[in-house]
Regions:
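Residue-level marker of alpha-helix boundaries and capping positions
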Residues: 65, 105, 126, 182-183
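N-terminal helical cap/lid subdomain that shapes the substrate entry/recognition surface
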Residues: 3-13, 17-109
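Asp-based, Mg2+/Mn2+-dependent phosphohydrolase catalytic module
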Residues: 1-9, 22, 88, 112, ...
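Glycine-centered short loops/turns at secondary-structure junctions
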Residues: 121-122, 199
Length: 229
């Protein structure tokens, strides 16, 4: 990758700039008190976090819709923990979670400072598989919104990363060719491989070090983007 030819950077949001797991835990902490959920939060999260990842994969692959994602990711966790939760409670909790989540705005360390540095040299864009209304509030409340020229979300395009269509759409609205753009995200499949498949460059953000490193460009901290850009 020759950085002199790069004009635009495309970021993922959740797990890349916006610390999803930390903010999600804070949201559930609030909701467990509000709804008087009789479970220890850490025990719930131990099951919920990988379960949520699995359900998001199904959603990304088009095997379930948004409503099933929101309901099933909670229902299955309560079932595994043998906690009696009515459908009414689960639906109410699912809706409240979506409303509460954007109220917490923890970003990964260095997020704002690296965006400040990069915006002087590149056009910054966002590509996200998250729900449009929720993602907008996350970006607004966390101070990320002013840094990005365009935001491409899967609900507006009708395709989710790693589908080539969402990348090509984002490149078109950003006014750049694939060879002039870099995708930065935490998902090897959705962000890195999806971008590479349309001719973009890609950098894999992995704040949790993996035992088996890949052959892709990788960073563990956002500030390390300056090594490549």
């Amino acid at each position: 990758m020759n950085k002199s030819t790069i004009k635009a950077l495309y970021f993922d949001l959740d797990h890349t700039l916006w610390d999803f797991e930390k903010n999600s835990a804070l949201a559930f902490k609030t909701l467990f008190k509000q709804y008087e959920i009789g479970l220890k939060l850490d025990e719930f999260l131990k099951v919920y976090v990988p379960n949520n990842t699995a359900y998001w994969r199904l959603f990304r692959e088009g095997k379930i819709d948004k409503e099933k994602l929101r309901y099933e990711r909670l229902k299955t966790v309560f079932d595994r923990l043998n906690y009696q939760a009515s459908d009414l409670l689960i639906y109410d909790l699912a809706d409240a979670y979506i409303q509460t989540l954007p109220e917490y705005n923890t970003l990964f360390p260095g997020a704002i400072s690296i965006l400040e540095t990069l915006k002087s040299h590149y056009a910054l864009h966002m590509i996200t598989n998250g729900f449009k209304d929720v993602q907008h509030f996350k970006m607004k409340n966390s101070g990320l919104l002013p840094y990005f020229e365009t935001i491409t979300d899967s609900s507006s395009v009708g395709k989710k990363k790693p589908d080539p269509e969402i990348f090509n759409y984002a490149l078109k609205v950003g006014g750049v060719r694939p060879s002039e753009a870099v995708m930065i995200g935490d998902s090897l499949e959705a962000d890195v491989e999806g971008a590479l498949n349309v001719g973009m460059h890609a950098i894999h953000f992995m704040p949790v070090v993996r035992r088996n490193p890949t052959h892709y460009k990788e960073i563990e901290q956002l500030e390390e983007l300056t090594f490549f850009l």
